[in-house]
Amino acid sequence: MMRHRGALLAVALEPTNMKKPKMRAVGVVPTQRQVAQLEHEHPEISRPTQLKVRTLDVGICGTDREICTFVYGAPPAGSDYLVLGHEALGEVVEVGSGVKHAKVGDLVVPSVRRPCPDPNCRPCQIDRQDFCATWKFNERGINQHHGYMTEFFVDDEKNFVVVPQELRHFAVLAEPLTIAEKGLTQVWQIQSRLPWACEEPGQPKGKGLRAVVLGAGPIGILGAMTCVLNGFDTYVYSRSPKPNDKAALVESFGAKYISIAECTPAQLAERVGNIDLVYEAVGVSKTSFEVMMHLGLNGVFVFTGIPAPEGHIQVEGNQLMRNLVLKNQVIVGTVNADKAAFQAAVRDLGEFKRRWPLALEKVISARHPVENFRELLTGKATGIKNVIAFGK
């Protein structure tokens, strides 16, 4: 008991040895080269602008699988493990006193990258850490920041986008879709250099243009959907010969599927005509540079994939340089995304659902219980997008 201003106040002291509550999580322990189910500290709101979110879905991607081979990925300072997961959908269960827009019960998707601490990094100072100038950012579930493959997580409201309830079953696709959203935004910025570049009222920007998407994985298929939505005559160039499930899916939303096994890059260019855009989503440098040799006049080539560091390829450097100069071509790489790209992804998922509901359903191959994590992260990759379902 303690006395304060003449009143008696009972003070309950928390035992110093009281353990904080734990919850399930999936992560890697790099020092032991383990992929494991972990007991992770249950998070609580510590700042007024934060949301506490219950995890519903977490998508599995190639980055997660690569982290599980221990080629990269680092735990936060003071931790010997890294909780995985950067593609997520959750439900708000608690809001801080300073939260302005989100409310309990909202569905939300979180972003991935957090700003670097350098006050002189102009991109990070304006929340454009996707263009961080110091390379000292951290990323949830990837580098020095725990991810979303756990039961609950807490983050600042500005790092979330609210999702309509009708997108409950698809919104986990928002993060991989942001790659195409940011990439296409940059394409329009680049192509504003063309003297005749202007929008026709009521017409999509890509009308009359041809796009080739390299790869039929989730990044490629979502990129192809975005290209079709924007009016491009869209071709997906991928390994497996027809007929196959991915080819059928691609053609169900209006794109065309061409197999690398049946058509060389030169033949591809003959079939397509002038290639205005190549959206690379395969992470294979040999195929990418072979197709780049056939990029059309005034074309743009967008790199999104990250190939393995080992290995070398031969490139026809002289011809490539001639093409870039004489054909007014541009090559651009894109990584990560800003909040506007997440908002665009949520908007376009709604449009995909309206136009191609069956195709959108097929992008998610299966939902799995948490207990299947090891097979999903370290076994043979199957299907298009596999999801771990934490909640209903």
Where are these regions (language model features)?
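Mid-domain Rossmann-like dinucleotide-binding core that forms the NAD(H)/NADP(H) cofactor-binding site
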Residues: 167-262
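C-terminal hydrophobic helical "lid"/dimerization subdomain
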Residues: 3-21, 289, 338-392
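Short SAM/SAH-binding signature in class I
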Residues: 275-281, 300
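Glycine-rich phosphate-binding loop and adjacent beta-alpha segment
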Residues: 285-351, 390-392
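Glycine-rich beta-strand-centered segment in the early N-terminal region that forms part
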Residues: 43-58, 73-122, 164-166
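Short amphipathic alpha-helix with an adjacent loop that forms part of the alpha/beta core around
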Residues: 262-273
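Residue-level marker of beta-strand positions
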Residues: 50, 87, 106-107, 123, ...
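NAD(P)H dinucleotide-binding glycine-rich loop of Rossmann-like/cofactor-binding domains
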Residues: 117-210
